[in-house]
Amino acid sequence: MTTPSSFSILLLLLLMPVVTNGEYSMQSEQEILNALLKNYDMRVRPPPANSSTEGAVNVRVNIMIRMLSKIDVVNMEYSIQLTFREQWIDPRLAYENLGFYNPPAFLTVPHVKKSLWIPDTFFPTEKAAHRHLIDMENMFLRIYPDGKILYSSRISLTSSCPMRLQLYPLDYQSCNFDLVSYAHTMNDIMYEWDPSTPVQLKPGVGSDLPNFILKNYTTNADCTSHTNTGSYGCLRMQLLFKRQFSYYLVQLYAPTTMIVIVSWVSFWIDLHSTAGRVALGVTTLLTMTTMQSAINAKLPPVSYVKVVDVWLGACQTFVFGALLEYAFVSYQDSVRQNDRSREKAARKAQRRREKLEMVDAEVYQPPCTCHTFEARETFRDKVRRYFTKPDYLPAKIDFYARFVVPLAFLAFNVIYWVSCLIMSANASTPESLV
């Protein structure tokens, strides 16, 4: 029969391992770290997983894009904030076979970062970068029982992005994000993307940029660096951006089209209204030149012709052509007016001579008491007069210009937009932008 005292002793013996395990697990991380770092040399890279002396360390990379804040066309750069993760195996840090009872699933030890070997990864296209340190440094480092290391850090970079602006503003831009070891060749470090999720996007990333939208990304491009010091393994992420066209439709194409249409009003103004037609032509031409300068100020100087240059050049040609058309019409009118003046003067001189020759041929005629009625021109007559081909050459030139110039501008638009859409569709893949 079990006595109360023996039952209490048995219960105490059953609870002792639980308490002991709790006290032991609180000390286990410190004991494991002390055991791992006792003979650890951070100056030596870890041996490969399948050999103790030779072979490269495989570094698996995963990137989470947290923010795309700016794409600067003038400086050809973009700003990105990301969580950069690297995984590799360091057999010297494996603690699953060290004899510890019930070891933790992993050790989170960011404070020992400076005591461990970490890949010397750098970003060749980076112009400026910084790590986030508020409230503490945004990074962590985990050690798993089999020696796998997970290193994660939040960084912000401004990276270069050489842009091809031939199709601006209907262009696609492919920006590369490269990472490579600075000192270790491919014999020492081999980079590879995480096969499950090489790149992650935070929800909403790429859709809130002012002028661009992130269309796609790829991670299969080869960027191995071959130099006189060796070959260095490299990983490349390509970001494909599409420029938002709606902004340029409202701010560029619509205003310039309206300026061209306004310049056509000159064809409908009387050819003798010199002040009005010249003022209209000069004003539209200066406005077109000002808009062209403002648009080019937002772009870097390049040595090739952009599709926006073709559009602006064509619009300026149509506006300038309207001014030249009036100059030609005015010149033709002045020539014909001079001819008429000479003919009129000749007729007056002829009549004067005929009067002097008439001596006795005068016949008395009583003064006329009749009245002359002038028919008023109706609105229909005015419209018919505008759309009826005149016989006077300067007026005939204006008449043809009212229809030929708009049709020419319409034909230019058809050719321009069809060509741009075809070229833009062909440039919508990263391979076409390499």
UniProtKB/Swiss-Prot annotation:
Can you cite a GO biological process for this protein? chloride transmembrane transport
Stretches assigned to the Extracellular side: 23-246, 297-303, 423-434
Q: What CDD domains does the entry give?
A: LGIC_ECD_GluCl (cd18993), LGIC_TM_GluCl (cd19062)
Q: What is its main location?
A: membrane
List, alphabetically, the InterPro entries matched. GABAA/Glycine_rcpt, GluCl_TM, Neur_chan_lig-bd, Neur_chan_lig-bd_sf, Neur_channel, Neuro-gated_channel_TM_sf, Neuro_actylchol_rec, Neurotrans-gated_channel_TM
**Any ranges marked Cytoplasmic in the topology annotation, and which?**
270-274, 325-398
Q: Which residues are glycosylated?
A: 50, 216, 426
User: Listed GO cellular component terms?
Assistant: chloride channel complex; plasma membrane; postsynaptic membrane
Q: Where is the signal peptide?
A: 1-22
Specify whether Cytoplasm is a keyword of the entry. Answer: no
**PROSITE patterns from the xrefs?**
NEUROTR_ION_CHANNEL
Cite the binding residues for L-glutamate: 66, 85, 152, 181
The UniProt GO MF terms for this protein read: extracellularly glutamate-gated chloride channel activity; transmembrane signaling receptor activity
| Topology in membrane | Multi-pass membrane protein
Localization, per the record, is:
Postsynaptic cell membrane; Cell membrane
Where on the tree of life does the source sit, at the highest rank? Eukaryota
**Transmembrane segments annotated in the record for this chain:** 247-269, 275-296, 304-324, 399-422
Q: List UniProt keywords, sorted A-Z.
A: Cell membrane, Chloride, Chloride channel, Disulfide bond, Glycoprotein, Ion channel, Ion transport, Ligand-gated ion channel, Membrane, Postsynaptic cell membrane, Receptor, Signal, Synapse, Transmembrane, Transmembrane helix, Transport
User: What is this protein for, i.e. what is its function?
Assistant: Glutamate-gated chloride channel subunit; channel properties depend on the subunit composition. Glutamate binding triggers a rapidly reversible current in heteromeric channels formed by glc-1 and glc-2, while the anti-helmintic drug ivermectin and other avermectins trigger a permanently open channel configuration. Channels containing only glc-2 are activated by glutamate, but not by ivermectin (in vitro). The heteromeric channel formed by glc-1 and glc-2 is also activated by ibotenate, and it is blocked by picrotoxin and flufenamic acid.
NCBIfam families linked: LIC
Assembly, in brief, is:
Pentamer. Homooligomer that can form functional heterooligomers with glc-1.
Query: Which family does the similarity line name?
Result: Belongs to the ligand-gated ion channel (TC 1.A.9) family. Glutamate-gated chloride channel (TC 1.A.9.4) subfamily.
Name by which UniProt lists this protein: Glutamate-gated chloride channel subunit beta
Q: Which organism is it from?
A: Caenorhabditis elegans
Name of the gene this protein is made from: glc-2
